[in-house]
């Protein structure tokens, strides 16, 4: 099952990278890798995330990171919509 990212999700990741590079450069690479790897596991378990705030979406909570990935399952595709910091208002 493919897991494409929307342009908005890709932009979210770029903002996360920029923030981490500026404030926590020693954590940037490992954090981004963990985000990618955890999202990749949705292929095997697409319903792993909780029901999302918007109808038809789900939210993947990262156990060791303060981020949430919003996604939707559409046909045979899992589409990553956004990545939020857990403290961020949506």
Label each region the model flagged.
Residues 41-42, 63, 83:
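Conserved catalytic core of Hanks-type protein kinase domains
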Residues 54, 64-65:
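Structural motif corresponding to alpha-helix initiation and N-cap regions
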Residues 57-61:
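A beta-hairpin/wing motif
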Residues 67-68, 72-90:
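Enriched for short, Lys/Arg-rich terminal
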């Amino acid at each position: 099952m493919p897991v494409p990212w929307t342009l908005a999700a890709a932009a979210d990741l770029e903002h996360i990278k920029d923030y981490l590079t500026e404030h926590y450069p020693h954590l940037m690479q490992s954090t981004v890798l963990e985000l990618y790897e955890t999202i990749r596991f949705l292929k095997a378990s697409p319903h792993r995330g909780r029901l999302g705030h918007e109808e038809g979406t789900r939210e993947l909570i990262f156990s060791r990171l303060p981020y949430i990935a919003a996604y939707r399952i559409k046909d045979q595709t899992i589409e990553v919509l956004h990545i939020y910091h857990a403290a961020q208002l949506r």
